[in-house]
Design a protein with these regions (language model features):
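Structural signature of hydrophobic alpha-helical transmembrane segments
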Residues: 1-8, 73-77, 130-135, 192-208, ...
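Hydrophobic alpha-helical transmembrane segments of multi-pass integral membrane proteins
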Residues: 110-141, 145, 379-392, 408-444
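Hydrophobic mid-bilayer segments of alpha-helices in multi-pass membrane transport proteins
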Residues: 5-15, 24-47, 78-84, 208, ...
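Juxtamembrane and boundary regions of transmembrane helices in multi-pass small-molecule transporters
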Residues: 24, 166-279, 474-526
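Re-entrant/interfacial helical elements at transmembrane boundaries that shape
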Residues: 134-144, 158, 171-182, 403, ...
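Transmembrane helical segments that form the transport core of multi-pass membrane transport proteins
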Residues: 257, 276-424
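Short helix-coil transition sites and intra-membrane helix breaks within transmembrane domains
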Residues: 75-77, 88-95, 125-135, 163-171, ...
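Alpha-helical transmembrane segments of multi-pass membrane proteins
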Residues: 112-124, 150-163, 188-207, 381-384, ...
């Protein structure tokens, strides 16, 4: 009964967005209200609330869960979304987006390669460095600028922002996953490397299938060519990511793998792509290129310098100007680093880049204000969704859903293990949050199934428990595609507010294929 009640918010959200075609902000807000009511009147009687909160007031527990959710939504998710779109709007205001568009089309006039370069290569690079929606918002906005339709731009950006998310924000999701199941609370480098490699193996077929889907959505008439490009780019991506994961850990697969994909796509375009029908191809001076790309170059520099790849700077930023808000009843403290978050890095990068592009500080602030006003519905959507996830977590709903799946599937559990991770990401919008919620559950089930020794998985030897734990992030990356939070980011970036349901409906078939293939890889690898 607890599992059935717990799944009501997820089902309701789908029904409102797909069945009633209700706008995303209205669907999310109404679902939050229903979730709060379930937490208040059903969670305790059904015994869903965790033992550590069993003696707490349900009203206080639920209220503070909503507060925590809103804090998490604003700091840093909404700030990052705002700054990502602000960075694009600066390019529009300075008209440098026209230079970038001409540069992309000077590489090749093959639309499929352009789209793949943006959403798979550039998008993966953004995910690896920053995460938190930048890899959906920025490529989608650039595609719109290149003349692609909003719905198409949103869909391919969501499909592209999947396999890289497990290693997004310099590997935070997989590192968190391993720390959650480590006995000491801090995973060894060997465990992180093994789990990273396992996740990439489980995702291997999707490194080829997803580029093929993206290419085919762009051009349905050249399937053989699409397959060849997908094999070329996909194999290079997965091999480079596997080597990085196996030898270096979780920090570099998305970054280096995406750079390899970018090089592979450009190489193919230069060698094999059809020649442009235009006799004269525009060339650009170094100064012109640096000016046009200054916003994104500064984003790359700021995020790399402030991130985990530069430990001294990262440690300094994380230890200074950190606000802490104690959350009674939840026994937790919400912390936000004012100078260490990706949102500030995006703001500084975009503003400095805008100045380089000739905009005054006053004009930049006008662009920022206009961007903020245009995102008002997105604010409601994101706050409602993250608060909803927090309420479901503290009321025990998410654990009840997972436990129900374990009870039903038994020995076939590895087949649905990625679905657990996908549910976590669908609800929370975050691969990292999904791993926090379900890492211990996956490890516990592995022990129940006797998966405690060593084995060989598609040619790689390692721990059976790590294989099943890795399945959580494998599924979580697929759930990212249809997470209402990701959908909200796509609608904002493509100026499609109110059409969340249409985007969700178009993405669901690809997400289901993703999760099913992930489940088959996990199951047959056992």
């Amino acid at each position: 009964m607890a599992s059935i009640v717990s799944i009501i918010p997820i089902v309701l959200l789908f029904i409102l967005m797909l069945g009633f075609k209700m706008a995303g902000h209205k669907s999310a807000l109404l679902t939050l209200v229903v979730t709060v009511l379930l937490a208040l009147f059903a969670a305790s009687p059904l015994g869903m609330i965790a033992p550590e909160h069993a003696e707490d007031s349900v009203i206080a527990l639920t209220g503070w869960a909503v507060v925590e959710g809103i804090l998490k939504a604003v700091f840093p998710i909404l700030i990052i979304i705002l700054m990502a779109i602000y960075s694009y709007n600066i390019l529009v205001e300075s008209k440098q987006i026209e230079v970038i568009k001409r540069q992309f089309t000077s590489i090749t006039d093959d639309k499929g390669l352009l789209v793949l370069l943006l959403v798979w290569g550039f998008g993966g690079l953004l995910e690896g460095m920053a995460g938190f929606g930048t890899a959906v918002a920025i490529p989608a906005a650039i595609l719109i600028g290149l003349g692609f339709k909003p719905m198409f731009s949103a869909l391919v950006s969501l499909i592209g922002n999947t396999v890289a998310t497990g290693f997004g924000a310099v590997g935070v999701p997989v590192t968190t996953l391993c720390n959650e199941v480590a006995e000491s609370g801090s995973a060894s480098a060997a465990q992180i490397c093994e789990t990273s490699a396992f996740a990439i193996i489980q995702l291997a077929p999707l490194f080829i299938i997803l580029p093929f889907i993206i290419l085919t959505l762009t051009d349905k008439h050249n399937l053989i060519k699409n397959l060849i490009i997908a094999l070329w780019v996909g194999v290079i991506s997965v091999v480079v990511q596997f080597v990085c994961g196996y030898y270096l850990g979780s920090e570099t697969p998305a970054i280096i793998g995406s750079l390899a994909a970018i090089i592979a796509i450009i190489a193919y375009a230069k060698v094999f792509a059809r020649k442009s029908k235009v006799q004269y191809k525009e060339t650009f001076t170094l100064a012109e290129s640096l000016k046009a790309w200054s916003v994104y170059l500064f984003i790359l520099i700021f995020i790399l310098v402030s991130g985990a790849l530069c430990p001294p700077v990262n440690a300094f930023l994380k230890s200074h100007l950190v606000s802490a808000v104690h959350l009674p009843v939840l026994d937790s403290t919400f912390k936000f680093g004012w100078i260490s978050n990706a949102g500030l890095m995006l703001f500084l990068s975009a503003t400095i880049g805008g100045l380089v592009q000739g905009l005054s500080l006053k004009r930049l602030m006008v662009v920022l204000a206009r961007t903020t006003v245009n995102l008002r519905k997105t604010v409601v959507t994101i706050c409602s969704l993250i608060a909803l996830a927090s309420v479901m977590n503290y009321s025990g709903m998410i654990t009840s859903i997972a436990s129900g799946l374990v009870a039903v599937t038994g020995d076939f559990y590895p087949l649905v293990a990625p679905m657990i991770g996908a549910i976590g990401t669908f609800v929370t919008g975050s691969d990292t949050s999904s791993n926090i919620l379900f890492a211990k559950l996956q490890a516990h089930v592995a022990n129940q199934l006797g998966m405690t020794g060593q084995s060989t998985f598609f040619g790689m030897e390692g721990g059976q428990e790590n294989w099943l734990v890795a399945a959580n992030t494998t599924g979580a990356t697929g759930g990212k595609m249809i997470s209402p939070q990701s959908i909200a980011i796509a609608t904002a970036a493509c100026d499609m507010e109110g059409k969340d349901g249409e985007i969700l409906r178009s993405a669901i078939p690809y997400a289901l294929l993703y999760i099913v293939l992930g489940g088959l890889m996990v199951y047959f690898g056992c």
